[in-house]
Amino acid sequence: MNLSSLKPVKGSTKTCKRVGRGQGSGCGGTSTRGHKGQKSRSGYSKKIGFEGGQMPIQRRLPKFGFKSINRVEYKAVNLSVIQSLIDTRCLAKIGIDDLVDAGIVSANRLVKILAGGIITSVVEVTAHAFSEKAEKAILKVGGTVIRTLKQ
């Protein structure tokens, strides 16, 4: 066997449809485009969103809202996640580095601690932001809350 004798497996290739090569081929004459009209001509391409002259949906519906350029996006971390980290790693202080090491957040994200779940251990938590309920829950069990500066 050599490279010059290799052929594709039978049935794996398909011959392309040759249009406009006589009536006997089944694709002659109009070349599968039907008779006359804009869509039968060469170079035809319909404008995106064109609905045949009807007012298109993007013009019928009103404009609304906007994206704030000053939006600060946080990665939410619940207290239940903090508690599971304390249980598995026996930590007294939990910072952003610990969350990154555990694979919970990526290094370049801002972190906000939310009050989902319960926390039972005394712990010092460092993050960029805290919800009011999360902060109260951490302080209630005797822990401390440290806010770091936003990067």
Curated annotation (Swiss-Prot):
Residues 1-45 are annotated as: Disordered. Residues 21-31 have a biased composition (Gly residues). It comes from Azobacteroides pseudotrichonymphae genomovar. CFP2. Part of the 50S ribosomal subunit. Belongs to the universal ribosomal protein uL15 family. The keyword Ribonucleoprotein applies. Keywords: Ribonucleoprotein, Ribosomal protein, RNA-binding, rRNA-binding. The gene is rplO. The keyword RNA-binding applies. One of its GO terms (biological process) is translation. GO terms for cellular component: cytosolic large ribosomal subunit. Binds to the 23S rRNA. The lineage of its organism: Bacteria, Pseudomonadati, Bacteroidota, Bacteroidia, Bacteroidales. This is Large ribosomal subunit protein uL15. Pfam families: Ribosomal_L27A. InterPro entries: Ribosomal_uL15, Ribosomal_uL15/eL18, Ribosomal_uL15/eL18_sf, Ribosomal_uL15_bac-type, Ribosomal_uL15_CS. GO terms for molecular function: rRNA binding; structural constituent of ribosome.
